[in-house]
Swiss-Prot record:
This is Recombination-associated protein RdgC. Keywords: Cytoplasm, DNA recombination. It is found in: Cytoplasm, Nucleoid. The gene is rdgC. May be involved in recombination. InterPro entries: RdgC (IPR007476). One of its GO terms (cellular component) is bacterial nucleoid. GO terms for molecular function: double-stranded DNA binding. It comes from Psychromonas ingrahamii (strain DSM 17664 / CCUG 51855 / 37). It holds the Pfam family RdgC. Its main location: cytoplasm. Belongs to the RdgC family. GO terms for biological process: DNA recombination; regulation of DNA recombination.
Length: 302
């Protein structure tokens, strides 16, 4: 139970629901599989999967929830081919060109006919509510995926007073200064990956991997017209990640020595290991995020 990505949000006021109420509300919007005519379905599942019996997993004031999504797979090419065949046949029969509205209606019919036979794929997105610090963390690689969970959570709770974390300073300017000056914040270390974007429209993007980010080559790019928009960092020799200009952490990796702290727990005891890993992860992230915020000059006041 270790998040691989972090989309970070701040509660503008404390979450007012107690655990029992939250549990009931989540159950009301529990996951139900797609019916024959459903394109997709969203709902809450037990964070511990088959080993769980609750829609929340609690460790102190830390609450873990899990969204499940099922999507029917309808290849666009198949729909397009069938639509073209039907349009061609009808136009030939009626001796006229079909209007856009008629084509759209035909397309909808084709989708409805294909849905019952379509394969489906499922995915899960975890979120962690830190009721102690009034934060919400979503393990999602994109804002769009995080918003999917947030939208259902807002519907589930009736309201969800959160805003994305906002920095006082521009992240790209701060990261550019770090590489230009070689002045990395204490307790952080550069890794070997970055993305540099031109300040000029259409000026290009440079993606660096396995690169010395303090080299003259990188500095030459920065002294021209480039800004650092993504940067690989390691904090306290414990957690490595890539941070972007929108304050999202991706490709998070917890050091082996950190994860091995729970190796003494019997692997067959899934519940105990899950609980210990969640407690370990939340404890580390609750130290990491304030350190990252401080490195970037602090959080903008609400």
């Amino acid at each position: 139970m270790f998040f691989k990505n972090l989309q970070v949000y701040r509660f503008t006021r404390p979450l007012e629901q107690d655990i029992d109420t939250l549990e009931r509300n989540l159950e009301e919007f529990k996951f139900k599989p797609c019916g024959s005519q459903d394109i997709s379905k969203l709902g809450w599942v037990f964070p511990m999967g088959k080993s769980g019996s609750m829609y929340t997993h609690i460790a102190g004031k830390q609450i873990l929830i899990c969204l499940k999504k099922e999507e029917k797979m309808l290849p666009a090419g198949v729909i397009k081919d069938q639509l073209n065949e039907r349009v061609e046949a009808i136009e030939l029969e009626q001796g006229r060109a079909l209007k856009k509205k008629e084509k759209d209606s035909l397309k909808e019919e084709i989708v409805m006919q294909l849905l019952p036979r379509a394969f489906s794929r499922t995915s899960q997105t975890f979120a962690w509510i830190d009721s102690e610090s009034d934060m919400l963390y979503v393990d999602a690689s994109s804002t769009r995926k995080a918003e999917e969970l947030i939208s259902l959570l807002r519907k589930t709770l009736g309201s969800l007073p959160i805003v994305p974390i906002q920095l006082k300073n521009q992240a790209d300017v701060i990261m550019t200064d770090w590489l230009t000056e070689g002045n990395i914040p204490a307790n952080f270390a550069l890794e070997d990956e970055a993305e540099l974007c031109s300040a000029l429209e259409g000026g290009g993007i440079i993606r660096c991997k396995q690169q010395d980010l303090l080299s003259d080559e990188i500095k030459n790019h920065l002294s021209a017209d480039k800004f650092v928009t993504k940067l690989a960092l390691c904090w306290a020799d414990s957690i490595s990640f890539i941070i972007g200009e929108e304050f999202a952490l991706k490709r998070i990796k917890f050091a082996d020595v950190l994860q091995e702290q729970n190796e003494d727990i019997d692997k067959d005891d899934f519940a105990a290991r899950f609980d210990a890993d969640f407690a370990l992860m939340t404890g580390e992230i609750k130290q990491l995020i304030p350190a990252v915020l401080a490195a970037f000059g602090g959080e903008q006041s609400l």
